[in-house]
């Protein structure tokens, strides 16, 4: 029996209602700025990259994953002036979109940090899929920003693993001196482990 073209398409293709679809404006690039050694310009790099992108009218989200919250204050947000932070997101108590703060730059938003993030490593240990908490949270803003810049914590713990599992690009600021290069080899080993087991897109 021959079916009308419209009837045939109805049988072959399912179009979900608009209420069930999520509009993606952008294919988002997620960039981690990471180095477990302090004082190498990690946060300065993350803030300036995010600010430059915003000045070029590129929708950008800066995520502060460092408990010192220097990236938060670096874009003009007073630390502690908000009720929730990235801490609440990574332990599953808040949606990422509910924590986003506007900055003075039209195209730059920030997810602020707080000192509470220090204790998140311990809380994450007991959670299922603890290495992917940030990656899953990012789905909440998928397609809204062209770039997401993540300022990683100065460590190689679970928070940094979360950052590396979420990113598809990594920038490693480094000083050309012995101890910085020694720490680089540890970071590269961690990156290879994440690429092998958690995030092949990194």
Q: What residues fall within each predicted segment?
A:
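P-loop NTP-binding core
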Residues: 1-202
């Amino acid at each position: 029996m021959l079916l009308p073209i419209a009837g045939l398409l109805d049988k072959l293709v399912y179009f979900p209602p608009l209420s069930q679809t999520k509009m993606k404006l952008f294919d988002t690039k997620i960039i981690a700025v990471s180095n477990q050694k302090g004082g190498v310009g990690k946060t300065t790099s993350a803030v300036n990259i995010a600010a430059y992108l915003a000045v070029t009218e590129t929708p950008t989200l800066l995520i502060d994953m460092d408990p010192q919250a220097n990236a938060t204050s670096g874009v003009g947000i007073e630390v502690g002036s908000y009720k929730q932070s990235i801490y609440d997101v990574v332990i599953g108590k808040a949606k990422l979109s509910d924590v986003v703060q506007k900055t003075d730059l039209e195209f730059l938003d920030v997810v602020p940090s707080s000192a509470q993030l220090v204790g998140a490593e311990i809380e994450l240990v007991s959670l299922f899929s603890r290495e992917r908490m940030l990656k899953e949270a990012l789905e909440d803003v998928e397609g809204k920003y062209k770039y997401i810049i993540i300022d990683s914590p100065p460590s190689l713990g679970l928070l940094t693993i979360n950052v590396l599992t979420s990113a598809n690009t990594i920038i490693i600021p480094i000083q050309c001196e012995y101890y910085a290069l020694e720490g680089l080899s540890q970071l590269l080993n961690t990156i290879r482990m994440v690429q092998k087991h958690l995030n092949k897109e990194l």
